[in-house]
C-alpha cells in the first residue's frame, strides 16, 4: 500500500500506476470520510483509496470511533492507527476493529497480541 499526506502526489501516483496499486487515503480524502462519518452521512463518501493510516486524534478530534472503522470496512478499506506504543491502547484499537497498528515497540505489540490469544509470530533470524 502506497501512502502520502499530499493529495495531488497520491492522485498522480494513482494515475501513473493505472490505479493498479493499493493506496492509503491522503489528507483530503481522510478528512472527508471522517467528517461524513461523524455527521452520519458516510454513505455519501466515495474514497478512491484502499486504506486509512491515521493517528487516534488530530487537532483535538478523535479519529478512533466505531462509525469511522465501520465506514472504512464497508468500503473494503483497511484502517491503521499510528503511532501506538501503549499496550492498553493497542488492545483497545484491536478490539475497535483496527486492521493494523504502526508502533515503535514491536516487542510490546507482540506481547499484547499474545495476551489477546493471537498465535505466536515467528521472528526471522538476522
Label every model-predicted segment:
Residues 1-99, 103-126:
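Short loop-to-alpha-helix "cap/lid" segments that border enzyme active sites
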Amino acid at each position: 500500500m502506497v501512502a502520502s499526506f499530499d493529495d495531488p502526489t497520491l492522485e498522480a501516483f494513482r494515475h501513473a500506476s493505472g490505479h493498479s496499486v493499493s493506496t492509503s487515503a491522503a489528507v483530503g480524502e481522510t478528512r472527508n470520510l471522517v467528517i461524513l462519518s461523524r455527521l452520519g452521512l458516510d454513505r455519501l463518501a466515495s474514497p478512491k483509496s484502499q486504506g486509512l493510516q491515521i493517528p487516534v486524534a488530530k487537532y483535538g478530534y478523535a479519529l478512533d470511533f466505531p462509525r469511522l472503522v465501520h465506514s472504512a470496512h464497508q468500503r473494503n478499506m483497511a484502517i491503521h492507527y499510528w503511532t501506538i506504543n501503549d499496550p492498553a491502547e493497542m488492545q483497545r484499537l484491536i478490539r475497535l476493529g483496527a486492521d493494523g497498528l504502526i508502533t515503535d515497540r514491536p516487542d510490546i505489540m507482540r506481547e499484547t497480541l499474545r495476551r489477546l490469544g493471537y498465535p505466536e509470530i515467528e521472528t526471522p533470524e538476522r
